[in-house]
Amino acid sequence: MWTFPVEYDVIVIGAGHAGCEAAYCAAKMGASVLLLTSNLDTIAKLSCNPAVGGIGKGHIVREIDALGGVMAEVTDLSGIQFRILNQTKGPAVRAPRAQVDKQLYHIHMKQLLEQVPGLHIMQGTAEALLDDGEKVLGVSTKEGWAYSGETVVLSSGTFMRGLIHIGTQNFSGGRLGDAASLGLSKDLKRLGFPLGRLKTGTPARLLSSSIDFSIMEEQPGDQNVCFVHREEAFVPKLPQVSCHITYTTDKTKDLIANNLHRSALYGGRIEGVGPRYCPSIEDKIVKFADKDRHHIFIEPEGLNTREVYVNGLSTSMPFDVQYEIIRSVAGLENAVITRPAYAIEYDYIQGNVILPSLESKILEGLFLCGQINGTTGYEEAAAQGLIAGVNAVNKVLHRPAFIPSRQESYIGVMLDDLTTQVLDEPYRMFTSRAEHRLLLRQDNAGMRLSHYGHALGLLSSERYAMFQKQKNCIEHEKERLAKTFRKYGDSIVPLTKILCRPEVSYQQLLTEFPEDVKDWGPIIGASLEMEIKYSGYISRQQTLIRSMEKAENTLIPEGIDYHSISALSLEAREKLSKFTPRTIGSAARISGISVADIQVLMVSLKKDAY
């Protein structure tokens, strides 16, 4: 087998969202990088929904930007609708989401990658890893040649032994229209990696000209929403479009109930476990039988196509049943299908075989990121790609691994969860997974993480200076407003106390006290308002973090009867009894154990003087 005459610092296998981020970041750090993909025309392809962000996910993309990654920039360049979700709820759960033009997203990502010095993008299909039994040495390809590398980042997506299901029909594929990867699974088994099966799915695509939008609810975008941190208000590069909302009907329920045996999922033909929080329409009908109808979102796939994505109608039903189900939905009575819905099973690596750096415990120098680790979602994959790419370079340079903590980032929450829990279903990020989410808002990602990005060489000095300016400005202004007293009602109070009132916004404070309050613009003003309004809660969370850090290594005595601690949640009592953790820290990392449970446990240990 011929070996390519260049030895790379980092070889990245797969150019999905994890692979692109890994290759980009590794090359930006000065490494020589090979990005190996089976098809150059599907780089960063949005295989499922044409959107980036959302609850928890939008926070991750903002963190990627704060660290110097690329996903946020490509999203802003490709966005055709931007929104803030949960606007009526607290600041911790507000999150940006963008509809993107699928084709432009691919084009912009490919263009950005092509401009990075030291990054070689090559079409080829990885067939096996090269190793000496202990350390990875490179990769061999299906085409018959090999590449040598100090480290390898494997981001295989849904391609490892991918099996597509449409009703009773199934066939090999990494996604519809693309071949599966068969060799890598076999090779990972050879090396001793435990493989399992997971499942995901995608709905049909329809022709927009065949849809009756007049009976649907229009869902326009919001102003001044973006993913890249900026000093000025954001103006989208592309024309902006609306999404639309419709609903299933009684006919939809009847069609699914009568054909459930023909579903690949319910017919017993799918072995893998699907994502709990992204169920198929047949799953919804079965598990939520009491609901009369379900939301369906019609989302444009791009500006230069009439195809739309039918969010909420994912299914593995046969095509003839899909046809009837789609036409049972209000406004879709005459819908023309352009691509069928399908489910896909794929291999992932089971068990706790990765370090928090995302390096494999089994083969030195091999880093794993994305769906191969059991996650689902573009954003989760991209964040892992950034961490894997950075740490592959750190490995080559003999530097310590970069591992952000769960107290300072959603990326840290995910890394901790992936390396301390055994996943039995696809992992998706939600704000509820973070114990200190008020500290991890999407608006303060730059202030939390930009110093890491700058130190790693990913974030330019200019952008780092912008983040520092914003941080210093907010800290200084908080202090100044706290020392500025004015009459409000019958009392003389500091301006911070006035702003803490729920009905008072920073803009109102600026209008009422123009000589005392500075206009820092909408971006800094919004962050400043949140920092002041929620200062009490933020302070308590910071105190709790310090307390938890102090208690991390506190021993839990053997034989403790968790069922006797009535203040613990039922789930906590069951799981603590099952796993019998030795320390408070290990107890806190068990899936389903909340911060409140840990606090109850700590109080109980002190009270009973174990």
From Swiss-Prot:
It comes from the Bacteria. This is tRNA uridine 5-carboxymethylaminomethyl modification enzyme MnmG. NAD-binding protein involved in the addition of a carboxymethylaminomethyl (cmnm) group at the wobble position (U34) of certain tRNAs, forming tRNA-cmnm(5)s(2)U34. Homodimer. Heterotetramer of two MnmE and two MnmG subunits. GO terms for molecular function: flavin adenine dinucleotide binding. FAD binds at G14, A15, G16, H17, A18, G19. It comes from Chlamydia muridarum (strain MoPn / Nigg). Its cofactor is FAD. HAMAP family: MnmG_GidA. Belongs to the MnmG family. NAD(+) binds at residues 274-288. GO terms for cellular component: cytosol. PANTHER family: GLUCOSE INHIBITED DIVISION PROTEIN A (PTHR11806), PROTEIN MTO1 HOMOLOG, MITOCHONDRIAL (PTHR11806:SF0). SUPFAM superfamilies: FAD/NAD(P)-binding domain.
